[in-house]
Amino acid sequence: MAQEQTKRGGGGDDDDVTDLGGPAGQERREKLAEDTDDLLDEIDDVLEENAEDFVRAYVQKGGQ
């Protein structure tokens, strides 16, 4: 029997940009860093307000 190998590429639309060394690349890195910081701040806010519920839900889903 023959086995086939499939190469899968990763995903987003504009993640395939290879030249991130120029000014556009720097701008993109800064935007991604800002978005990441905003998301982490939102997670921190949720945990501060609702840590017990978060932990309970996490444990119920099989987390340790």
Curated annotation (Swiss-Prot):
* Family affiliation: Belongs to the prokaryotic ubiquitin-like protein family.
For this UniProt record, the keywords arranged alphabetically read as follows: Coiled coil, Isopeptide bond, Ubl conjugation pathway
Check the record and name the Pfam families matching this protein.
Answer: Pup
Pathway membership, UniProt: Protein degradation; proteasomal Pup-dependent pathway
Function of this protein? Protein modifier that is covalently attached to lysine residues of substrate proteins, thereby targeting them for proteasomal degradation. The tagging system is termed pupylation.
Q: How is it modified after translation?
A: Is modified by deamidation of its C-terminal glutamine to glutamate by the deamidase Dop, a prerequisite to the subsequent pupylation process.
**Which parts of the sequence carry Deamidated glutamine?**
Q64
What are the GO MF terms of this UniProt record?
proteasome binding; protein tag activity
Question: Which terms does the UniProt entry file under GO BP?
Answer: modification-dependent protein catabolic process; proteasomal protein catabolic process; protein pupylation
From which organism does this entry originate?
Mycobacteroides abscessus (strain ATCC 19977 / DSM 44196 / CCUG 20993 / CIP 104536 / JCM 13569 / NCTC 13031 / TMC 1543 / L948) (Mycobacterium abscessus)
Residues covered by region (ARC ATPase binding):
21-58
Coiled coil, from the record: 24-52
Q: Which cysteines are joined by disulfide bonds?
A: none
Extent of Basic and acidic residues compositional bias:
1-11
| Keyword Ribonucleoprotein in record | no
| Subunit structure of this chain's protein | Strongly interacts with the proteasome-associated ATPase ARC through a hydrophobic interface; the interacting region of Pup lies in its C-terminal half. There is one Pup binding site per ARC hexamer ring.
Gene symbol? pup
Its organism's taxonomic lineage begins at: Bacteria, Bacillati, Actinomycetota, Actinomycetes, Mycobacteriales
Domain comment in the entry = The N-terminal unstructured half of Pup provides a signal required to initiate unfolding and degradation by the proteasome but is not needed for pupylation, while the C-terminal helical half of Pup interacts with ARC to target proteins to the proteasome.
The record's listing under InterPro entries reads: Ubiquitin-like_Pup
Q: Where is this cross-link: Isoglutamyl lysine isopeptide (Gln-Lys) (interchain with K-? in acceptor proteins)?
A: Q64
Q: The organism sits in which domain of life?
A: Bacteria
Q: Where is this region: Disordered?
A: 1-36
Task: State what protein this is by name.
Answer: Prokaryotic ubiquitin-like protein Pup
